[in-house]
Amino acid sequence: MSWLFGIKGPKGEGTGPPLPLPPAQPGAESGGDRGAGDRPSPKDKWSNFDPTGLERAAKAARELEHSRHAKEALNLAQMQEQTLQLEQQSKLKEYEAAVEQLKSEQIRVQAEERRKTLNEETRQHQARAQYQDKLARQRYEDQLKQQQLLNEENLRKQEESVQKQEAIRRATVEREMELRHKNEMLRVEAEARARAKADRENADIIREQIRLKAAEHRQTILESIRTAGTLFGEGFRAFVTDWDKVTATVAGLTLLAVGVYSAKNATSVAGRYIEARLGKPSLVRETSRISVLEALRHPIQVSRRLVSRPQDALEGVILSPSLEARVRDIAIATRNTKKNKSLYRNVLMYGPPGTGKTLFAKKLALHSGMDYAIMTGGDVAPMGREGVTAMHKVFDWASTSRRGLLLFVDEADAFLRKRATEKISEDLRATLNAFLHRTGQHSNKFMLVLASNQPEQFDWAINDRIDEMVCFALPQREERERLVRMYFDKYVLKPATEGKQRLKVAQFDYGKKCSEVAQLTAGMSGREIAQLAVAWQAMAYSSEDGVLTEAMMDARVQDAVQQHQQKMQWLKVERPDSEASKPPHPSLLSC
């Protein structure tokens, strides 16, 4: 049964590292120091031993040895022994791991403490450096302050020194000038006394010299007079006695006077004639009258105008049927008046802006075979005193036309205002009087056509000189459609089909679109519709492909309508508050 106690077990099985010895008991050291007399004797040691346990163990070993499960029991004992050894080894490993962990923790703590120590040392170094820098800055600032105070003190001392030196210099100069003045006064006084003394002493000599000079001067003058009289007398006597010389002299003086007077008046007359025939008055902005300078500059255009036939008065002018019939009668009457060399009638055309007044005046002149001249009423007031002369020049120039002249005054209400109620300057009043004087009677040389947006502001004398009043109202739906079609053809279709211009029109119903535009542009004038067509052309040119689409036309129409509404709002705001509830004047909207 020796295997049960591990005495005869196989080597290498279940053996592990030796277990650590238990720590010595506190009393072991003291027990080792006891004397030999204190040790118990062998007899006493085994006197209390009970062998019963050993007997039972030996008996159990013999039974187990003879048992058939002896080998399993041995293996079980060995496995238990190995398990215990493994447990001891794992505990040992845990102990070693704990020791290593404790060492690593100690290292980490030491590193943390060292890091904290380094951080604290760094912070202390930084604080010390900042404090030293602060002290250095304070020392530097103190040095600067001390240096500034020292500089200020030196500057103050220098200024005081300069002031003292300046005061000393000024005092020195004043003293020097005072002494010089005293010396000068003494010198002048001495010279005056010496001169007076010399004059008193030489008074008789001076009087004698003056008397001799006067006598000599008188004698010289008398001799000169006698000599000149003798010469002139002899010459006049010789001239009078010779009648041929007298006659020639009188004739020469007469011819000289006549020549000077004739040259002066001839130059003035020639200048006025050249100005009236060749030039153009300053008030005339545009004219179809041909001048010599224009013929020299543009001979081909002038020749075409000379051979051109009279045009239709309403070509390119779209009006309502009633207004068209009336203005056609005026055009026919004007043409027949020119043929019969009768007196022209004065016409007033009033209505909103952009309704075709200026265009009809030009067409009327071309239809009648007359020249036209356009002047603006706003150009008269700035001329001041020259306005009267300029107005007479205009009518003198108009009277020299061989074909007859249609004088169109645009914005005539700018200077033909009421003299009784309106506050106008004296120069403008004189210009108005000159205009009334030149238009007091009808003429067979020129026809006066006035255009105004506010005819109620005319002076009563102007109304008395008007023979025919024509109201140009805003176009209605039919006229607007005709205008839209005409300008669409002029500014869009013709540029798209003629030439090499970068303009194309998308495929849509042009007639239907023109009707829609005419419906949307209610209240707009012919000029606004023309501007709308020009805007279509500009939008097509500004597009990437140069194509005018229906959407682009609609966008421009909406913009034009909004702008027209904004203009109407401005027109309402411009009126006085007392007239805010009243509708606008008929001349601003319709007739």
Curated annotation (Swiss-Prot):
<keyword id="KW-0472">Membrane</keyword>
<protein>
    <recommendedName>
        <fullName>ATPase family AAA domain-containing protein 3A</fullName>
        <ecNumber>3.6.1.-</ecNumber>
    </recommendedName>
</protein>
<feature type="topological domain" description="Mitochondrial intermembrane">
    <location>
        <begin position="2"/>
        <end position="245"/>
    </location>
</feature>
<keyword id="KW-0007">Acetylation</keyword>
<feature type="compositionally biased region" description="Basic and acidic residues">
    <location>
        <begin position="31"/>
        <end position="47"/>
    </location>
</feature>
<feature type="topological domain" description="Mitochondrial matrix">
    <location>
        <begin position="264"/>
        <end position="591"/>
    </location>
</feature>
<dbReference type="GO" id="GO:0044233">
    <property type="term" value="C:mitochondria-associated endoplasmic reticulum membrane contact site"/>
</dbReference>
<dbReference type="GO" id="GO:0001558">
    <property type="term" value="P:regulation of cell growth"/>
</dbReference>
<dbReference type="GO" id="GO:0005743">
    <property type="term" value="C:mitochondrial inner membrane"/>
</dbReference>
<dbReference type="GO" id="GO:0140374">
    <property type="term" value="P:antiviral innate immune response"/>
</dbReference>
<dbReference type="GO" id="GO:0030291">
    <property type="term" value="F:protein serine/threonine kinase inhibitor activity"/>
</dbReference>
<keyword id="KW-0175">Coiled coil</keyword>
<feature type="binding site">
    <location>
        <begin position="351"/>
        <end position="358"/>
    </location>
    <ligand>
        <name>ATP</name>
    </ligand>
</feature>
<dbReference type="InterPro" id="IPR003959">
    <property type="entry name" value="ATPase_AAA_core"/>
</dbReference>
<dbReference type="GO" id="GO:0043066">
    <property type="term" value="P:negative regulation of apoptotic process"/>
</dbReference>
<feature type="region of interest" description="S100B-binding">
    <location>
        <begin position="289"/>
        <end position="304"/>
    </location>
</feature>
<keyword id="KW-0547">Nucleotide-binding</keyword>
<dbReference type="GO" id="GO:0007005">
    <property type="term" value="P:mitochondrion organization"/>
</dbReference>
<feature type="modified residue" description="N6-acetyllysine">
    <location>
        <position position="494"/>
    </location>
</feature>
<keyword id="KW-0378">Hydrolase</keyword>
<feature type="modified residue" description="N6-succinyllysine; alternate">
    <location>
        <position position="490"/>
    </location>
</feature>
<feature type="coiled-coil region">
    <location>
        <begin position="55"/>
        <end position="216"/>
    </location>
</feature>
<dbReference type="GO" id="GO:0005739">
    <property type="term" value="C:mitochondrion"/>
</dbReference>
<dbReference type="GO" id="GO:0006974">
    <property type="term" value="P:DNA damage response"/>
</dbReference>
<dbReference type="GO" id="GO:1903898">
    <property type="term" value="P:negative regulation of PERK-mediated unfolded protein response"/>
</dbReference>
<dbReference type="InterPro" id="IPR021911">
    <property type="entry name" value="ATAD3_N"/>
</dbReference>
<feature type="transmembrane region" description="Helical">
    <location>
        <begin position="246"/>
        <end position="263"/>
    </location>
</feature>
<dbReference type="Pfam" id="PF12037">
    <property type="entry name" value="ATAD3_N"/>
</dbReference>
<feature type="modified residue" description="N6-acetyllysine">
    <location>
        <position position="512"/>
    </location>
</feature>
<dbReference type="Pfam" id="PF00004">
    <property type="entry name" value="AAA"/>
</dbReference>
<feature type="region of interest" description="Disordered">
    <location>
        <begin position="1"/>
        <end position="52"/>
    </location>
</feature>
<dbReference type="GO" id="GO:0016887">
    <property type="term" value="F:ATP hydrolysis activity"/>
</dbReference>
<dbReference type="GO" id="GO:0140468">
    <property type="term" value="P:HRI-mediated signaling"/>
</dbReference>
<keyword id="KW-0496">Mitochondrion</keyword>
<dbReference type="InterPro" id="IPR027417">
    <property type="entry name" value="P-loop_NTPase"/>
</dbReference>
<dbReference type="GO" id="GO:0042645">
    <property type="term" value="C:mitochondrial nucleoid"/>
</dbReference>
<comment type="function">
    <text>Essential for mitochondrial network organization, mitochondrial metabolism and cell growth at organism and cellular level. May play an important role in mitochondrial protein synthesis. May also participate in mitochondrial DNA replication. May bind to mitochondrial DNA D-loops and contribute to nucleoid stability. Required for enhanced channeling of cholesterol for hormone-dependent steroidogenesis. Involved in mitochondrial-mediated antiviral innate immunity.</text>
</comment>
<keyword id="KW-0999">Mitochondrion inner membrane</keyword>
<comment type="subunit">
    <text>Can form homooligomers. Homodimer formation at the N-terminus may be regulated by ATP and is required for the interaction with the inner surface of the mitochondrial outer membrane and correct mitochondrial homeostasis. Interacts with components of the mitochondrial ribosome and with other proteins involved in mitochondrial RNA metabolism. May also interact with protein involved in lipid metabolism, including STARD9. May interact with FAM210A. Interacts with GADD45GIP1.</text>
</comment>
<keyword id="KW-1135">Mitochondrion nucleoid</keyword>
<feature type="modified residue" description="N-acetylserine">
    <location>
        <position position="2"/>
    </location>
</feature>
<keyword id="KW-0067">ATP-binding</keyword>
